[in-house]
Amino acid sequence: MIDFGKFYQQIACGPLAHWLETLPAQVAAWQRDALHGQFKQWKNSLDNLPALVPDQLDLLHSVSAQSAEPLSDGQRKRIEQLLRTLMPWRKGPFSLYGIDIDTEWRSDLKWDRVLPHITPLAGRTILDVGCGSGYHLWRMVGAGAQLAVGIDPTQLFLCQFEAVRKLLGGDNRAHVLPLGIEQMPALNAFDTVFSMGVLYHRRSPLDHLWQLKDQLVKDGELVLETLVVEGDENTVLVPGERYAQMRNVYFIPSAAALKNWLEKCGFVDVKIADFSVTTVEEQRRTAWMETESLADFLDPHDATKTREGYPAPLRAVLVARKP
């Protein structure tokens, strides 16, 4: 099993200590009752990875690690083989001892769009909701975060995160927990909460915003990145069965409507910070994610539309404060 004991020890004397009233029992129940059918296979790959300590570690500009003595061809091939058993890799990229994990998403591009608009992360305790393999957690650490906690119920992502952590020297400044936001008590303990690429997957988006608010300290900052459509404060797209081939897309508001939603939930100082059309340079099929990607989800004759005829993916970043 993956050991969360170090995380429990880490939070025992800080503002997250009251989480220990519920968290260990939740994780124990997950380990007992809810493991994915392939979890043992993924965990076996994780166990067989060497625990490396990098001589050069860059989390500020990328997630990359190097050793003073290059790995042998055999070592590198073995590590790459083990990492490939954890495919598909969706969020990255990672560069680890000469192995470049070219993920489906260039998550570094999103980070470059978000970072200029937020309160500096130095010394902050951070929650990243729907964190995937944890790429952005490492970038948060690189930006000076004291502690970056990610939650994501997808167990493959947890194993990918732990694999990267093992190759980064067992760094304990970032952690991923196999939970959804709805499983968290109202901690009111995080300085910054990120929700990126999650809102449109929620059946009740306003409930999601309230849940995010419940995790923030007073004057804490929410960083919300999500799909939007063009339009005024009354514009919300409710797709049919699929949007860009995704079945679980429920509401896509305009940025103006989303600003209203945030204010309705009690957030203040709401700013629409960035718009970005998703391109096939940012989301694409790679050797580490071999199934369909954005190019397959767009109308082959009109890239401004999805295959279903909806507007192609447009993403916005909004920043807000909990009073």
Swiss-Prot record:
UniProt KW tRNA processing keyword: yes
Pfam families in UniProt: Methyltransf_9 (PF08003)
Gene3D superfamilies recorded: Vaccinia Virus protein VP39
GO molecular function term, any single one: methyltransferase activity
GO BP: tRNA wobble uridine modification
EC number: 2.5.1.-
Keywords: Transferase, tRNA processing
Superkingdom, natural source: Bacteria
Family note: Belongs to the class I-like SAM-binding methyltransferase superfamily. CmoB family.
Function recorded in the entry: Catalyzes carboxymethyl transfer from carboxy-S-adenosyl-L-methionine (Cx-SAM) to 5-hydroxyuridine (ho5U) to form 5-carboxymethoxyuridine (cmo5U) at position 34 in tRNAs.
Quaternary structure annotation from Swiss-Prot or TrEMBL: Homotetramer.
Protein name: tRNA U34 carboxymethyltransferase
Annotated source species: Cronobacter sakazakii (strain ATCC BAA-894)
Name of the gene: cmoB
